[in-house]
């Protein structure tokens, strides 16, 4: 990602499955799943007395068959916890695609991890994701995202954690997440201003497919790039909702073709199928077509 301008990641992040690192069987199953990314969780889903066992599970898993065409993210415990240092040593040893920091409250939380990765000569490809799941995290979302433009920060993505946010604020679960929308949109505005991606929070009732569909559609309409998932049954719907449909792809290709026509040279606004289209729409169209190509390549590589 270019740090001097808000250029977004080119990775697919429609479906981001969280898997407890303590569950060795679930780890193995991720290889065959169609999710775009996997979060290997060492934090909330692992009891304190089993943290060391979970780290050993991840060591064994990473030494085996690689996860092809999936981002691998390790969610660590807070660095100021008794587990944080051991988790970071594991991250440095395994070199996943990203480390996910829990309860990020301020820019310094990101920069301290960035400095630690730099001091350890971790590869630049090892990125940072931030859980935004506290009142301070929401209030400081823009400042945290801006830290992503600091040279060497490695910040790529925000993940919203509504379970913790509800607990800390007292906000009750509600269809449509009416009272949470301002907070969610604050996250979207922050990442868009500074070229990051945003992943929506988990939906806890994985058996309620209709409600999950509705929440995915809601998140996509707000501008989220994907959804954090707790069960493989949610992958297909997330991929569908956060991926472009055929009509959108066709429209984007028409916009690209229209601006490529020599007659459009030097024009900032043109007519495409009866609509006035600006060059800013060309950028959006190119991004959408690129995303569609990445999805097609994933399907071919299966």
Spans of model-derived segments:
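Expand to "…catalyze enediolate/carbanion chemistry for C-C bond making/breaking, isomerization
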Residues: 1-302
């Amino acid at each position: 990602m270019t740090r001097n301008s808000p250029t977004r990641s080119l990775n697919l992040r429609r479906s981001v499955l969280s898997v407890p690192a303590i569950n060795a069987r679930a780890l193995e199953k991720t290889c065959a799943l169609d999710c775009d990314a996997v979060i290997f969780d060492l934090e909330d889903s692992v009891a304190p007395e089993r943290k060391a066992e979970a780290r050993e599970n991840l060591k064994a898993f990473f030494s085996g068959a690689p996860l092809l065409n999936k981002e691998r993210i390790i969610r660590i415990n807070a660095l100021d916890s008794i587990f944080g240092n051991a988790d970071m040593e594991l991250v440095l040893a395994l070199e996943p695609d990203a480390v996910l920091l829990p309860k990020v409250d301020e820019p310094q939380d990101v920069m301290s991890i960035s400095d630690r990765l730099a001091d350890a000569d971790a590869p630049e490809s090892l990125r940072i994701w931030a859980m935004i799941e506290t009142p301070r995290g929401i209030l400081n979302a823009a400042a945290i995202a801006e830290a992503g433009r600091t040279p060497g920060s490695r910040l790529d993505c925000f993940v919203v954690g509504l379970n913790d946010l509800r607990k800390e604020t007292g906000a009750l679960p509600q269809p449509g997440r009416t009272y949470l929308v301002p907070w969610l949109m604050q996250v979207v505005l922050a990442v868009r201003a500074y070229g990051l991606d945003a992943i929506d929070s988990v939906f806890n009732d994985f058996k309620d497919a209709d409600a999950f569909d509705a929440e995915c559609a809601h998140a996509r309409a707000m501008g989220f790039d994907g959804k954090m998932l707790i069960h493989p049954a949610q992958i297909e719907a997330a991929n569908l909702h956060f991926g472009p449909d055929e009509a959108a792809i066709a429209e984007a290709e028409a916009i690209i073709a229209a601006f490529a026509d020599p007659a459009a040279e030097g024009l900032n606004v043109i007519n495409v199928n009866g609509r006035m289209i600006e060059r800013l729409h060309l950028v959006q169209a190119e991004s959408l077509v690129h995303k569609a190509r990445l999805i097609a390549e994933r399907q071919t590589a299966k």
